Design a protein with these regions (language model features):
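Metal-ion/cofactor- or nucleotide/acyl-coenzyme-handling active-site neighborhoods
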Residues: 2-320
Length: 320
């Protein structure tokens, strides 16, 4: 299987000519763009404009034969020397160059190469008059299936999804993207609680700052080597269980933008073949609690961003 993330990072070392995206918007003249993610569920190409799909997403092709379908694949997946491969558009070369440029610009904001989905959204937000996003929330699960070999990493683990949602949150007001918003309660958490034995449940946080516990997890540098110590492993598992069951109002009470950004590094490894992963990313039991924690962190960023945007809107209204 191609190591697409390794392939992508090679492009950070290469020289790239910079495109004027404003001029490119005039050249391509996108009026309506629909971006279809790889989440589950049926979908059809948009009836107007251009539809973007990823890595050959399947659809009933004869249902809308007259519409333009553009496929974007990352270079590693497509076994190409380029960072992206664009098929189905007459200006595929320009789109490939623009996607690469945006991805390189996003990388330092994320600490890793961005997903093709976020890269396309950020680019199209600058190139198209109207952008709709479907079957995508930038929140794939880090819960490892029981049949995944212990030495294999989840493909989605190489991206900083909390960081991607942080960047996308600022674009949401200008996009048609109903699936992006998170509910305050992470519903899968309820079934996880029901399945747990009483002796497995760590003490819940009532008044303490959950970010302090995340900081302890970060300071412990809990790599695979440390997992050889059963006591350390069990202690950190209990931390994860505690955090996964912490009520959202407690998270919101202590959430600060800088803290939220600092926690992002706990939940991805952009180079798992050469850089050891935090043990809980590779552990079937521990990984079951990561989505609930990430959901709380992402929801905190969502509410803080919404509140900030509302304050700015009120200031502008009062000043006019």
């Amino acid at each position: 299987m191609p190591k697409s993330h390794t392939h992508m990072h090679q492009h950070l070392q290469m020289p790239h000519a910079k495109l004027d995206l404003q001029a490119l918007a005039g050249t391509l003249a996108f009026e309506q763009v629909t971006i279809i993610g790889n989440a589950s569920g049926d979908w059809q190409p948009a009836t107007t404009g251009t539809t973007f799909i990823f890595n050959g997403t399947q659809w009933a092709e004869n249902s809308n034969a007259n519409n333009q379908i553009v496929n974007i694949a990352n270079g590693g997946f497509a076994e190409s020397k380029y960072a992206f491969v664009v098929q189905g558009h007459p200006q595929s070369g320009l789109l490939t160059q623009a996607l690469t440029q945006v991805a390189i610009e996003l990388t330092p904001q994320l600490g890793c190469w961005p997903s093709s989905g976020l890269t396309t959204i950020v680019l199209m937000q600058q190139l198209s008059q109207h952008v709709q996003v479907q079957r995508m929330s930038l929140f794939p699960s880090l819960s490892r299936p029981s049949d995944l070999p212990l030495e294999d990493h989840l493909p989605c683990m190489v991206h900083n999804w909390l960081g991607e949602r942080r960047i996308a949150q600022a674009l949401v007001p200008s996009l048609d993207w109903p699936e992006f918003s998170l509910a305050s309660v992470f519903l899968p958490r309820l079934s996880a609680i029901n399945q747990m034995q009483p002796c497995q449940v760590a003490p819940r946080i009532n008044a303490d700052n959950p970010f302090d516990l995340l900081e302890r997890l970060q300071e412990s540098n809990s790599l695979i080597a440390d997992a050889l110590n059963p006591a350390t492993r069990q202690m950190q598992l209990e931390w994860l269980i505690t955090l996964a069951h912490t009520p959202i109002n407690i998270w919101q009470q202590f959430a600060h933008p800088s803290q939220l950004i600092n926690t992002e590094a706990l939940f991805f490894n952009h180079m798992p073949e050469s850089k050891p992963s935090n043990w809980y990313l590779m552990d079937t039991q521990a990984s079951q609690y990561l989505d609930a924690i990430r959901h709380s962190l992402a929801y905190c960023w969502q509410t803080l961003s919404t509140k900030h945007a509302s304050l700015i809107g009120n200031e502008l209204s009062n000043g006019s």
